[in-house]
Amino acid sequence: MEFDSYIDWYNNLLTMPLNDVILGVKDTIEDKTVYLSLSDSKVIKMDNTSFVMGYYYQVVLSVKDVDDELVGLVGNVLQNGWNMTNWSENSHLYNYTGTVYLPCGAGGQAWQ
């Protein structure tokens, strides 16, 4: 799936049965939660000028069941699907990671 901006992608996530979408990290991870972090930017350079065209986000999904429907739903809006990272003994959750590239929105910021 292609999205025009972070807000477009975020609004799509809000249609899914997630408990929360968090930009950043928390001390504890929770079931059916997506954690986002900015990982890189796509920059175009010409002469002495450069333009940020978009951003890459690292996405982490935490779920109780390995076959939770969210694994497929959120995986469909990522660049290359999921990698199963680990099973957390502390939280008893499966953690999946993936990446999504989103072009800059109208304002040009990573969260627009």
From Swiss-Prot:
One of its GO terms (cellular component) is virion component. GO terms for biological process: symbiont genome ejection through host cell envelope, long flexible tail mechanism. It is found in: Virion. Keywords: Viral capsid assembly, Viral genome ejection through host cell envelope, Viral long flexible tail ejection system, Viral penetration into host cytoplasm, Viral release from host cell, Virion, Virus entry into host cell. It comes from the Viruses. Probably functions as a stopper that is part of the head-tail connector and that locks the viral DNA in the capsid. During assembly, functions as a docking platform which the preassembled tail can bind to. Plays a role in morphogenesis of the virion capsid after genome packaging. Belongs to the skunalikevirus head completion protein 2 family. This is Probable head completion protein 2. It comes from Lactococcus phage p2.
